[in-house]
Amino acid sequence: MFHKTEEFFPKKTDSDVDDMDTSDTQWGWFYLAECGKWHMFQPDTNIQCSVSSEDIEKSFKTNPCGSISFTTSKFSYKIDFAEMKQMNLVTGKQRLIKRAPFSISAFSYICENEAIPMPTHWENVNPDVPYQLVSLQNQTHEYNEVASLFGKTMDRNRIKRIQRIQNLDLWEFFCRKKAQLKKKRGVPQINEQMLFHGTSSEFVEAICIHNFDWRINGVHGAVFGKGTYFARDAAYSSRFCKDDIKHGNTFQIHGVSLQQRHLFRTYKSMFLARVLIGDYINGDSKYMRPPSKDGSYVNLYDSCVDDTWNPKIFVVFDANQIYPEYLIDFH
């Protein structure tokens, strides 16, 4: 498992390193992660990292100006001791690395949770782009599942295209929120549903990158609270969809078409999202978050609905409870 420091390491000169490099000093190797913390190199069964901090230190002592290569389940990397950088040999992305004295008391685990794996059915995942849109083939089980939900209240023959949204960051936020709610409630499962959200084309890319934000996307009256609205039925969500003209591409990377833009069609867009509705209560226009269950500021409901006996409309106030999973284009 990776480790992190509580503070950034102070910079040291070459002479400082030479003076401190004694046989009694235990050295550790770290890389600067996306979160801004220094993480220790350690073998990890989830990502199948082939190198440890100890391995890097041995290589460094052999040749302080050399390099060492290693792999994970997805990529190959090279550590350059002269540049003090780690390079992804596939994408070219670089990270800063650092050698520093290791003390057990100075480090703690990043988190209690295991690394979150990506869904096994995702395809050609590129972690260096914000998101990917992958068109589903209409003969697949995945396509038919989405089309069937749409078809409960609308004619599925109106569907022109269904695309899977692959956003690693949003997926991780969603999974961690789900784990947090389960831990807080002390339950093995949290109430989760696939729900529809209709919108206009101008918001589609922002949602795919940043998730839903009612302050930007609008709340259509906010009758049940100031949050993001979802519907059980596609027919209801279709009221908020606007016609748009776009090209009929089959694969996109963060909104950039990989095919020629020569076929233009008029269609509307609707999201099918995975939503943690949890414990819900009847909504109210004054709510800016779910109300309390017992009057405290701690024990809150997770979402609001139009009718607790037969909910058709759901309002979510925390975007981490949402993963925008599919984009449905229809006429």
From Swiss-Prot:
Residues found modified as N6-(ADP-ribosyl)lysine: K11
UniProt xrefs under InterPro entries: ARTD-AVP, Poly(ADP-ribose)pol_cat_dom, WWE_dom, WWE_dom_sf
Keywords tagged on the record: ADP-ribosylation, Differentiation, Glycosyltransferase, mRNA transport, NAD, Nuclear pore complex, Nucleotidyltransferase, Nucleus, Protein transport, Spermatogenesis, Transferase, Translocation, Transport
Residue positions, PTM ADP-ribosylcysteine: C49, C65
EC class of the enzyme, as a word: transferase
Phenotype seen when the gene is deleted: Knockout mice are viable and are born in normal Mendelian ratios. Knockout males, but not females, exhibit a striking fertility defect, with the majority of males being sterile and a minority producing infrequent and small litters. Sperm from mutant mice exhibits mild to severe teratozoospermia, with structural defects in elongating spermatid nuclear envelope and chromatin detachment associated with abnormal nuclear shaping.
Every PARP catalytic domain range: 116-331
GO molecular function, one term: NAD+ poly-ADP-ribosyltransferase activity
Cell location: Nucleus, Nuclear pore complex
Catalytic reaction equation(s): L-aspartyl-[protein] + NAD(+) = 4-O-(ADP-D-ribosyl)-L-aspartyl-[protein] + nicotinamide; L-cysteinyl-[protein] + NAD(+) = S-(ADP-D-ribosyl)-L-cysteinyl-[protein] + nicotinamide + H(+); L-glutamyl-[protein] + NAD(+) = 5-O-(ADP-D-ribosyl)-L-glutamyl-[protein] + nicotinamide; L-lysyl-[protein] + NAD(+) = N(6)-(ADP-D-ribosyl)-L-lysyl-[protein] + nicotinamide + H(+)
WWE domain ranges (all copies): 15-99
Tissue-wise expression: Predominantly expressed in testis, preferentially in postmeiotic germ cells. Also detectable in other tissues, including liver, lung, spleen, thymus and brain.
Gene Ontology cellular-component annotations: cytosol; nuclear body; nuclear envelope; nuclear pore
A GO biological process held by the record: cell differentiation
UniProt entry tagged with the keyword RNA-binding: no
Record has Nucleotidyltransferase as a keyword: yes
Post-translational modification: Auto-mono-ADP-ribosylated.
EC number(s) recorded for this UniProt protein: 2.4.2.-
Family: Belongs to the ARTD/PARP family.
Function of the molecule: Mono-ADP-ribosyltransferase that mediates mono-ADP-ribosylation of target proteins. Plays a role in nuclear envelope stability and nuclear remodeling during spermiogenesis. Inhibits the type I interferon activated signaling pathway. Mechanistically, mono-ADP-ribosylates beta-TrCP/BTRC to promote IFNAR1 ubiquitination and protect BTRC from ubiquitin-proteasome degradation.
Protein name: Protein mono-ADP-ribosyltransferase PARP11
Organism (species): Mus musculus
